[in-house]
Amino acid sequence: MGNKLTNISTNLKSSWLTAKSGLNRTGQSLAKAGQSLKTGAKKIILYIPKDYQYDTDKGNGLQDLVKAAEELGIEVQKEESNDIAKAQTSLGTIHNVLGLTERGIVLSAPQLDKLLQKTKVGQAIGSTENITKGFSNAKTVLSGIQSILGSVLAGMDLDEALQNNSNELTLAKAGLELTNSLIENIANSVKTLDAFGDQINQLGSKLQNVKGLSSLGEKLKGLSGFDKTSLGLDIVSGLLSGATAALVLADKNASTSRKVGAGFELANQVVGNITKAVSSYILAQRVAAGLSSTGPVAALIASTVSLAISPLSFAGIADKFNHAKSLESYAERFKKLGYDGDNLLAEYQRGTGTIDASVTAINTALAAIAGGVSAAAAGSVVASPIALLVSGITGVISTILQYSKQAMFEHVANKIHNKIVEWEKNNPGKNYFENGYDARYLANLQDNMKFLLNLNKELQAERVIAITQQQWDNNIGDLAGISRLGEKVLSGKAYVDAFEEGQHLKADKLVQLDSAKGIIDVSNTGEAKTQHILFRTPLLTPGTEKRERVQTGKYEYITKLHINRVDSWKITDGAASSTFDLTNVVQRIGIELDNAGNVTKTKETKIIAKLGEGDDNVFVGSGTTEIDGGEGYDRVHYSRGNYGALTIDATKETEQGSYTVNRFVESGKALHEVTSTHTALVGNREEKIEYRHSNNQHHAGYYTKDTLKAVEEIIGTSHNDIFKGSKFNDAFNGGDGVDTIDGNDGNDRLFGGKGDDIIDGGNGDDFIDGGKGNDLLHGGKGDDIFVHRQGDGNDSITESEGNDKLSFSDSNLKDLTFEKVNHHLVITNTKQEKVTIQNWFREAEFAKTIQNYVATRDDKIEEIIGQNGERITSKQVDELIEKGNGKIAQSELTKVVDNYQLLKYSRDASNSLDKLISSASAFTSSNDSRNVLASPTSMLDPSLSSIQFARAA
C-alpha cells in the first residue's frame, strides 16, 4: 500500500507542475486582500483556523490530514481567521472545501473534516480497524484532490489572473466549483471512507494530463469502482462526452444547414443516451420504492426534455454563418484589388460561429438532460442524489463553457491580429486598414468610370478634377476592433483623379491634395484652358489623426480619437478658367452634440482661395471663405446649398471688386463633421473606436463672414439677401428670395432673380433686370437700361434723370398695350403682365393745373424697345396717348413699328443694347433656366449613399 501511495504521490506531483509554474510567480496583490497577504507563493494551502476545534470522539481525521499534507508537500497553515476571511471574501470563494485566495488555493480543513464526519463515513472511522487506516485514506483523498486540480487549472496563470481580475480568474473559480461538486457528490454517495478515498484517487488519476473538456469525457469513460446506483458517474461521463462530440461543428467546410443539423443531432444523441440511462435507473428506483412508473411519468420526462431544446438558439448561429458567407462573397472583388480584410472578417465570423454552435449545442443538451432527470426523479427520495448531482454538474459545466468561450473567441481574434501584423511586416511603411480604403476607392472608381469619363462634356471643361473622400467603413472598423488594432485605423482617406478629353489621367503630377496640411493646388493646368474641380463626396476637414486605446472596464475598451486640426484649406488655381463647387467641402465641425444629435457647439474650418488668372466661378459652402479672384472675370456664387441670407455692404470699400459678405445661417440642417463611435464585439469584449465623418446635423444657427477680393460678380442665395454696392462698378444677382439690391455709385449690373425684389441702381449708368416676381425697380441718376421678359411678373419702375431705356426682350412692340392710369404709364404684354412706369404724366399734369409750374423731375423712360429693335420714344408715347384719349391705338403703334427710318436707326442702337444684355448673361439663380452653369446630371450607383454631386446652380 505504501509503494502504491508513493507512486500515486509522485504522479500527482508531476501533474501539478504545470499549474504550479504559474502559481510560483510573485506579483502585486489585490488591493482588497490587504497588506498582510502581499507576499507569498501561489500554492495549495491546507488551512486550519487557530481557533478550530475538531471532534476527537469521531476520529482523528484532522490529524491524519495534517500528516498526509506534510508528506505530499502541501503547506499546512494556521491563520488568524480574520486574515483568511478577508482574502476569501474579496474573491467570493468561501464555504467550500476548496477556495481561491490571493495567496493560493486554500483547502479548508474544517470543510473537509466535515465531509469525513458524515454519518456513514464517521461510523466507519470510529472503528479501531479504520482508525489505523486513517493516515492512508487521508493521503489518498488529498492526492486525488491534487490531481483533479492539476487538470482543472492546467495552463492557468493564476498570479496574473488574481492581479487583473481577468476572465481566467472567473474560469478558475468555476473549475474549483466543479471540483467541489465532484468531491461533495462522491462524499454523499459512498458508504465508507475507503470508498471515498479510492474513488477520489481514481478520479484524480483519470484526469492526469487532461487538457480541457475535449478529452475529459473520454477519460471518465469506463471509470471502475463506482456504484451506478449511488453515484451515477456514467451519467457525468456521458455529459462530458457530449461536450467533446459537439466540437464536430468546427468543420470549416460544412454548410450552415449541416452545422445546424449537427447541433440537433448532437443534442438528441446526448439527450437520448443519457436520459435513457437516467430514466431507466430512476424508474427502477421508483418501482423499488413502490412509486408510480406508468406511461404518464415517462411522458413527463420526454416532454420536459423536448421543451429544453429551442431551435431559436441555433437560428442565431445560422445567421452568423450566413453573414460569413456574404462577407466572403463581398471580399472577392477587394481581394483582387489587394485587400483581404473582408475575408479575415468572414474567417472570424465562421470561427466564432463554430464556437457558438458548439457551446449552444452542449448547453442545449445539458438543459435537456437536467430537465429530464429532474422530471424523472420527481417524488423519488432514492433518486434525489442523482438529480442533484446532474443538476449541479450540468450547471458548473455550462459556466465553464461560457467562460471558456471568451478565451476561444480571443484565440480566433488573435489569429486575425497576427495576420494583419504579418502583412504590415511584409509591406514596410504600409497600413493594413489604409490599404482597405484604397481598395474601396478603386472599386468605386471602376464602377463610375463611364460617368467620370463623360464629365468633360457634361461640365463643359477641358479638364475635370474629381476629389473623392472615402469615409468611415464599418467592415474596416469591425476588423480594427476585433484585432485590437483600433489605434492604426483612419476615419477615411481622400483621393484625386483627373480627366481630359474623356481620358483618365494620373492626377498626382497635376494636382496636390494634402489633407494633413490643408492644401489643394490645381495651378498646374498645362494646356487646359478650362477646368472644373468637383468634390464627389463631402471632404473632411484637414489635419492628422492619432488614436489611443484605453481600458474602461473588465471587458470594455475605447480607442479615443485625437485630431491635430489645421484651421483652413488653402486652394491655389492657375491660368485656366476654373469652376469650384465648395459646397461639398466640410467646414463646420460639431464639437458638442445633445442627446438628440443636434449640434450645440461648433468650430469652423476656413477656405482661402487664390484663383489666379482666368474667368473663374466659385460656389461658396457653409463656412468662412476668403477669395482672391486675381485676374480675369470672376464670379462668386451663393446659390447652391442652404447657407443663409447675405448682407453685403461695400459702401466703404476703396478697391473695386472687394466685398465683405456677412451671412446668418438659420437653424436647420447643415453639413457638419462630427465624431461618432463604432462598436465591435468579441464575445464579452467590447471595442469602441472613435471616428469622424460628415453628416447633415441640426444646428441652432450661426454667423459667418466672407472676404472677397478682385471679384466681378456675386450671385445671391435663395433667401432674402441685401446688397449694397460700392462706388465702383458692381454686378449683383439676387437669386431666389425677396432681395434688396442697391447699386450705389458706379455703372452697375443688377439682376433680381426670382422673388419680389427691390432694386435701386443709384448713380451711374445701370443695367437692371428684375427677373421673375413683382419687382420694384428704380434707376436713379444716369442712363439706365431696364429689361422685362414674358413670365417676369408685374414690375414697377421709378426713373429720374438720364437717357433711359426699357427693353421687352421677347415681345414685339406692336403686341404691347400702352395706357395711362392716373399719373402712371402701364404697359401690358400678351401674358397680361404689366410694367408700370411710375409718375410718367405727373409733371405734365402739374404744369396744366398749376400756373407757372416748372418741371423739376424727369420720371419718363426715353425709349421703349421691342425684341427686334423696334422702339417708341417718350415723346411719341405722350403724343399717341393724348391722341388716343389715354390709350395708344394698335393701328398707331403699328405705324411706329413700320416706320423704316426709325427701324434703321434702331438697328445700330439694338446692337449696343444686345451687348449690354449679353454681358449680364452670367446672372442666374438656382431655378432659372437662363445661362445656368453646367453641373453633372448623371448619378452614381444608388447603393453608394455617401456619394454626392455638385448641386444644380
UniProtKB/Swiss-Prot annotation:
Protein modification: Acylated by LktC. The toxin only becomes active when modified.
Its cellular-component GO annotations read: extracellular region; host cell plasma membrane; membrane
- One annotated GO molecular function: toxin activity
Main localization, broad class: secreted
Top-level taxon of origin: Bacteria
Task: Cite the InterPro entries for this sequence.
Answer: Hemolysin-typ_Ca-bd_CS (IPR018511), Hemolysn_Ca-bd (IPR001343), RTX_C (IPR013550), RTX_pore_form (IPR018504), RTX_toxin/Mannuronan_C5-epim (IPR050557), RTX_toxin_determinant-A (IPR003995), Serralysin-like_metalloprot_C (IPR011049)
Keyword Magnesium (UniProt): no
Transmembrane annotation, as ranges: 230-250, 297-317, 359-379, 381-401
Q: What miscellaneous comment appears in this entry?
A: The lktCABD operon has a complex mosaic structure that has been derived by extensive inter- and intraspecies horizontal DNA transfer and intragenic recombination events.
By sequence similarity, the record places it as follows:
Belongs to the RTX prokaryotic toxin (TC 1.C.11) family.
Domain comment from the record reads as follows: The transmembrane domains are believed to be involved in pore formation in target cells. The Gly-rich region is probably involved in calcium binding, which is required for target cell-binding and cytolytic activity.
Q: What is this protein's name?
A: Leukotoxin
Organism, by scientific name, is Mannheimia haemolytica (Pasteurella haemolytica)
Q: What lineage does the source organism belong to? A: Bacteria, Pseudomonadati, Pseudomonadota, Gammaproteobacteria, Pasteurellales
Gene symbol here is lktA
